[in-house]
Amino acid sequence: MASLSRAPQQWATFARVWYLLDGKMQPPGKLAALASVRLQGLHKPVYHQLSDCGDHVVIMNTRHIAFSGNKWEQKVYSSHTGYPGGFKQVTAAQLHRKDPVAIVKLAIYGMLPKNLHRRTLMQRLHLFPDEDIPEDILKNLTEELPQPRKVPRRLDEYTQEEIEAFPRVWSPPEDYRL
């Protein structure tokens, strides 16, 4: 009878969990690092390279990702068709305008292990450019992952009371003119 009581525990351990991750104002590399751990199942104590125990990851707002510095124009994605003269290069800004999901997808694809399980793991990744997620995926969601980076508030999001209560580092003298 002991094996019957352990069966539900084993199914709960290997069950697939659906995680939601918001990509708004987040760097693609940080999203990829967080998602690849969940897709592979590295966060589970029963993880093994040959066991398929990864979870589903749903990432929304991929249209609103953020790069630091001038990476929108400096980062180049390249591909080759295999034919002479088939080498193509496109900047991150051009690729993002064409397909707002592609940058996050390529970042996660690059973070996954380079073996035969890679495409199977990518099938458990669900990317959406905005907050519109289909109803059949929404009902499967079980947990929301915290964003890897804190999103800063814009200046127009502060109230006048918060601005006045903010500590002043320097106060100008009476005869100072702007």
Swiss-Prot record:
Provide a GO CC annotation, any one.
Answer: mitochondrial large ribosomal subunit
This protein's source sits in the domain of life called Eukaryota
- Cite the InterPro entries for this sequence: Ribosomal_uL13, Ribosomal_uL13_bac-type, Ribosomal_uL13_CS, Ribosomal_uL13_sf
**Which compartment or compartments is the protein found in?**
Mitochondrion
Question: How does this chain assemble?
Answer: Component of the mitochondrial ribosome large subunit (39S) which comprises a 16S rRNA and about 50 distinct proteins. Interacts with OXA1L.
Similarity section? Belongs to the universal ribosomal protein uL13 family.
| Protein's UniProt name | Large ribosomal subunit protein uL13m
